[in-house]
């Protein structure tokens, strides 16, 4: 079979990671998820926590960072260093001679020009995501709602910082799936 790459991005709380893992298992391909963070942090020469903290700071300072030019702060330096390391890791892994699924980490944008690839976006209605989070993590409805909105905002800001695009837009997506449909999971 010819090598292929699938990137999967998603809304928080829609059980997309489980869908992505099942797809990778069914297809018998590599699955890259949170291990991308570890590899990128190592390559950037920063701790995993610093890498994740730099992403969180992107959310807190997104407007300032998007408008700034150059390295205005150590946070931005770490963010830029972390992003570059992550992009390099994703490209290095995609250049291997094996098929793979990349989950999140802006891989849809990073690999947009690679041959034989498909970008998938998984989503679900807010109510379904809240219900899933309540059942899976024993959260109250208001806690789950607040968490989903915060994480979605963070991911949107991070995606915008890295790509200049809006996460979830149809541009650069080949397939969008509502995972609330019971046959998907």
Regions found by a protein language model. Give the residues of each.
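Pre-Walker A (Motif I) flank of P-loop NTPase domains
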Residues: 2-11, 98
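Short beta-strand-centered segment that lines the nucleotide-binding/catalytic pocket of NTP-utilizing
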Residues: 30-41
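A glycine- and Lys/Arg-enriched "phosphate-lid" helix/loop adjacent to the NTP-binding pocket
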Residues: 120-163
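ATP-dependent NMP and nucleoside kinases share a basic, alpha-helical "lid"
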Residues: 89-137
């Amino acid at each position: 079979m010819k090598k292929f790459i699938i990137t999967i991005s998603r809304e928080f709380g829609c059980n997309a990671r489980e869908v992505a893992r099942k797809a990778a298992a069914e297809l018998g391909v590599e699955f890259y998820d949170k291990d991308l963070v570890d590899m990128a942090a190592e390559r950037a020469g920063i701790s995993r926590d610093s890498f994740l903290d730099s992403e969180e700071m992107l959310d807190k300072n997104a407007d300032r960072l998007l408008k700034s030019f150059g390295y205005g702060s150590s946070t931005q330096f770490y963010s830029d260093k972390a992003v570059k390391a992550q992009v390099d890791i994703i490209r290095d892994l995609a250049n291997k001679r094996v098929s793979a699924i990349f989950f999140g980490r802006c891989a849809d944008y990073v690999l947009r020009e690679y041959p034989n690839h498909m970008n998938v976006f998984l989503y679900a209605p807010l109510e379904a995501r809240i219900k899933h989070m309540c059942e899976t993590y024993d959260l109250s409805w208001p806690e789950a709602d607040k968490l989903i909105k915060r994480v979605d905002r963070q991911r949107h800001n991070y995606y915008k910082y890295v790509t200049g695009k809006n996460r979830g837009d149809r541009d650069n997506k080949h397939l969008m799936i509502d995972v609330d449909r019971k046959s998907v999971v």
